[in-house]
Amino acid sequence: MSDTQHSFGKNGLTATVSAHGAELTSLRTTSGQDLLWNAGPAWKRHSPVLFPIVGKPPENTTLNGQPVTLTQHGFARDMTFRWLERTETGCVLELEDTPETWQLFPAAFRLHLIYRMEETGLHVGYVLTNPSEDATLHASLGVHPAFMWPLNPETGRENHRLTFDTNEADHIRRISPDGLLPEAVPSPIHDRILPLQDSLFEADAIIMLDARSKGVDFTGPDGSGLRMRWEGFKDLGIWTKPGAGFLCIEPWYGYATPVGFSGDFSEKPGLLHLQPGESWEAFWSVEPV
């Protein structure tokens, strides 16, 4: 059994997870269709875990009196997780704080990822625990799966859409190199539908704070595609690089640092605040439709 990756499946749907970043690196249907982006030159990741921050951190900030030196989206995506369990239908991985992580983020944590292939699709669970006896854990966690766009390589990118499971707010937020912009702008989502086109992402990601939906269908010209669902996350990002062959659907708990924020890391908007011994759980799932 490989120490670096684990493949599993059920009912013809197969997945591969890497110990590096606990990242889902492949998701393939019974017909051999790849649902997940191949980490090609346009973006060299598949489905990174964003922890302990989503987006860019505040500049020159501290936590518990010590400097925070995180880079965008944190360090979990680039660390080696420990295998706790590997079976024919899933796996469990763990990441805990180390002297190395304390140099970047001075806090104790324990993060479990639980991958499980169910009857119709893949379920990915997250359990974040604060093992400290006396300090609150202030952190964010987000997911960043990149799905193939076009869904079917034999079709073009035209006539793909997202259909949300409920009506969303009439405004969205955007980011700049300096962080989350304060202004709300009109939403391109109407009657639950977002027709996909590259021009939507010329201003970077579509950001939905306190998103109402807990699921979305991503479909192509013939109506087939995938259904994604989630619980435990508050916010949502939709992103691609214009012209690239993928679309990221990103449930988050947290978001990029607002432009102009200069406080202590614990005061950054959007964070989880876990008391000693407390845990937070969330999941997302995806199935072909």
Give, region by region, the residue ranges found by the protein language model:
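Beta-strand-rich interaction surfaces with strong enrichment in secreted/lumenal proteins
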Residues: 112-114, 269-274
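Short Pro-Gly-centered flexible turn/kink motifs
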Residues: 17, 63-67, 126, 272-288
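Extended, loop-rich substrate-binding clefts of extracytoplasmic carbohydrate-active enzymes
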Residues: 70-119
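Short, Gly/Pro- and small/polar-rich lid/capping loops
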Residues: 1-11
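Active-site/ligand-binding surface loops and adjacent short beta/alpha elements
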Residues: 136-138, 146-230
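Acidic-aromatic substrate-binding/catalytic surfaces of carbohydrate-active enzymes
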Residues: 14-68
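Acidic/His-leaning functional-site neighborhoods
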Residues: 13, 73, 78-85, 190-269
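Short, well-ordered beta-strand segments enriched in hydrophobic/aromatic residues
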Residues: 15-17, 113-115, 122-132
